[in-house]
């Protein structure tokens, strides 16, 4: 093994770079050419632009958006339960009797 010179940066040490340049070949020998070739060719990892994937959305369900702990009771009307026509008749009869007072 070559002696390591502390005065030279690690990337400039002898044997730190391959003697041949990287190429576009994907054969086994070229895939193991250097660490960069192994990552790009062997593992298929590149730092290029990544494709944008659409988000997965769940189908809209109104039950998903409600509070499951509290179910509020239906509002109960207060007072007498009467038909609207009957209530109009009562109001008319009251107004007629009040007019004579």
UniProtKB/Swiss-Prot annotation:
InterPro entries: IV_Tat, Tat_dom_sf
Chain positions covered by the region annotation Disordered: 1-20, 45-101
Site note Essential for Tat translocation through the endosomal membrane, residues: 11
Record region (Transactivation): 1-48
Gene Ontology molecular function, alphabetical: actinin binding; cyclin binding; metal ion binding; protein domain specific binding; protein serine/threonine phosphatase inhibitor activity; RNA-binding transcription regulator activity; trans-activation response element binding
Entry superkingdom: Viruses
Record PTM: Asymmetrical arginine methylation by host PRMT6 seems to diminish the transactivation capacity of Tat and affects the interaction with host CCNT1.
HAMAP family found in the cross-reference section: HIV_TAT
Stated name of the protein: Protein Tat
């Amino acid at each position: 093994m070559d002696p390591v010179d502390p005065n030279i940066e690690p990337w400039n040490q002898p044997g730190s770079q391959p003697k041949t340049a990287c190429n576009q070949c994907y054969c086994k020998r070229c895939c193991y050419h250097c660490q960069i070739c192994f990552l790009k060719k062997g593992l298929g990892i590149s730092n290029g632009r990544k494709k944008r994937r659409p988000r997965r959305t769940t189908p809209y369900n109104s039950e998903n958006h409600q509070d499951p702990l509290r179910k509020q009771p239906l509002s109960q009307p207060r007072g007498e339960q009467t038909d609207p026509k009957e209530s109009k008749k009562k109001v008319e009869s009251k107004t007629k009797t009040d007019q004579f007072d």
